[in-house]
Amino acid sequence: MKTRLVLVFLFGGIATSVAADESPAFKVIEVQQTGGFAGVNITYRITPDGEFTRQSGRGTVEGQLDAKEAEVLSNAMAGIDWDKMPAKLRDPRVADDFAYDMHFVISEKTHRVTADGTSAAQNAQLEPILMMLVRIQRVPLKQEQ
């Protein structure tokens, strides 16, 4: 089964880590993660103030990144060298891994990177972003009483 994870990054800024006179790093991050061995279908959304939502067939989780996490994410986004980022990061030996289809919108220009999970995690510029998604994925669902 082929897995697909779609990341959409719209640049604007994280309030907790960007001063008013600085150029903002991003505006909103939206991620659609599907496939894998378990056939997952998860949607992520992270706003500039660090608020996040994760939705799946099991339910919805809402939360807040702490200031350090928001800063790490903002710095990771600002640190991507778009001139050196390959459009495709794929390892033909990788099977049944997540696939990432990432869209990065900066002003009027869109950058797209497709990658399998292994290759994306080994890319120093993308790895901090993927690790933040893993952190959000681990937030437990609240049990209704």
Give the residues covered by each predicted segment.
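Sec-dependent N-terminal signal peptides
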Residues: L5-I14
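N-terminal secretory signal peptides
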Residues: E22-G63
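Short, well-ordered, aromatic-rich surface patches in folded extracellular/luminal domains
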Residues: K2-T3, V18-G36, K68-E69, A76-M77, ...
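Short linear sequence elements within intrinsically disordered, low-complexity coil regions
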Residues: I14-T16, I42, D49, G57, ...
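Acidic, aromatic-enriched beta-alpha/helix-loop junctions
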Residues: G57-I80
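A broad, structure-centric signal for solvent-exposed, well-ordered loop/edge residues
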Residues: V8, A38, T53, V72, ...
